[in-house]
């Protein structure tokens, strides 16, 4: 079997662009994968198109060879964009391989370890603050005050979610706003230091959510790159009484992350922004986190399984970074089904309602668990007609 064509397709996803790669073969089998576009500040699409020139003619059933060969061409100028582009091609090859053998992707790696995976509600409330007009247009209740966070907590429990994760939301201006400094351009985002008042406001926000959740549903906070080591420690120590499922943060320095983990009783989750086994090695071998977050769309599912195996050797659980659409959900689900050391899976349940039509078989969730399908490949194809019905706006 040979790759004959590689295309990228995109559609309007509301506040984001939904992006897909389509890999065609000489035997008529088509492989799909979802990928992120824009996280690096520029588009990954031209990078995928550049790698496509080398990938055409390769055998997609040899997905590991395809991935390693393409990555080898980047050694003098490796980086996140290259990894993400190669990962998209690798993942589409995995879909082809599963379809060619008539099995789900997890079966290519000895799975499944489980037939369902617990999920948590990510960006709970915070994205409704960040994109208020869109969410109200889609029929979701707005978040205007702390009482609305309590209401959302109750809603999450009623839907069976095992945990929820939010981001800092402040109410000290005329309108509430989400603050996730460190990498998103906003006033003061380069300071990377919360004031005592801001930390106090974060505690109040989490207390409001906890009131709605009760004591048996996990509560997480994601502050991304918003602090330096000292700031992360101040925040983590202030949150200890809340008994968080985890505090999620990002840093490029393994020693700093180790200082944070060892300096607080709050469980620490991190590493979602890393690419490749070698970047993960010092963090995992140094036991810098309670939960290692791996992105199977940025790294590729096969490469991510290698990272997860390394984590397992150091008694560390894995959770996938997964703030994407329905095909991405299915890809992360297959990744989780192939792992023994997965803890929980990220899910954004309040997306633009039309995005479920972008796949032929949307994921099924029962009592807070996403069910692992037995269909070949990822378990669904992309609905190209639905993509055409929702073209990108203002491109």
Region locations from a protein language model:
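Extended hydrophobic packing segments that form well-structured cores
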Residues: 377-395
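Shared catalytic-loop signature of beta/alpha-barrel
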Residues: 46, 51, 65, 237-244, ...
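Ligand-binding pocket scaffold of soluble enzyme catalytic domains
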Residues: 6, 21, 26-27, 32, ...
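Glycine-rich phosphate/pyrophosphate-binding beta-alpha loops
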Residues: 11-14, 34-42, 75, 122-129
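Metal-dependent enolase-superfamily TIM-barrel catalytic cores that perform enediolate-based chemistry
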Residues: 116, 121-258
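Metal- or metallocofactor-binding catalytic centers and their adjacent structured scaffolds
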Residues: 24-101
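Structured beta-strand/loop patches that form or line metal/cofactor-binding pockets in enzymes
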Residues: 1-32, 36, 351-356
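Conserved, mostly hydrophobic/aromatic
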Residues: 3, 28, 51, 89, ...
